[in-house]
Amino acid sequence: MKSERAKQIIDSKKYIPVYYKNTPVHIEKVDNKENIAHIKSLNTDKEIVVNVKTLSECNKLNN
């Protein structure tokens, strides 16, 4: 995913499913300069920082 798309998802009024390594997540914020996203797992509530490219709108494992 590109950082611009991640920002669009954050700003969207509707729910858009996002996945990190096949785990559903919520994008908390995006840093466009560093190309990173602060995310929260919907399964565990664990918060982590990841490269935006590792996020997906479809439920597929990203390498």
UniProtKB/Swiss-Prot annotation:
<keyword id="KW-0749">Sporulation</keyword>
<dbReference type="InterPro" id="IPR012610">
    <property type="entry name" value="SASP_SspH"/>
</dbReference>
<protein>
    <recommendedName>
        <fullName>Small, acid-soluble spore protein H 2</fullName>
    </recommendedName>
</protein>
<dbReference type="GO" id="GO:0030436">
    <property type="term" value="P:asexual sporulation"/>
</dbReference>
<dbReference type="GO" id="GO:0030435">
    <property type="term" value="P:sporulation resulting in formation of a cellular spore"/>
</dbReference>
<dbReference type="GO" id="GO:0042601">
    <property type="term" value="C:endospore-forming forespore"/>
</dbReference>
<dbReference type="Pfam" id="PF08141">
    <property type="entry name" value="SspH"/>
</dbReference>
<comment type="similarity">
    <text>Belongs to the SspH family.</text>
</comment>
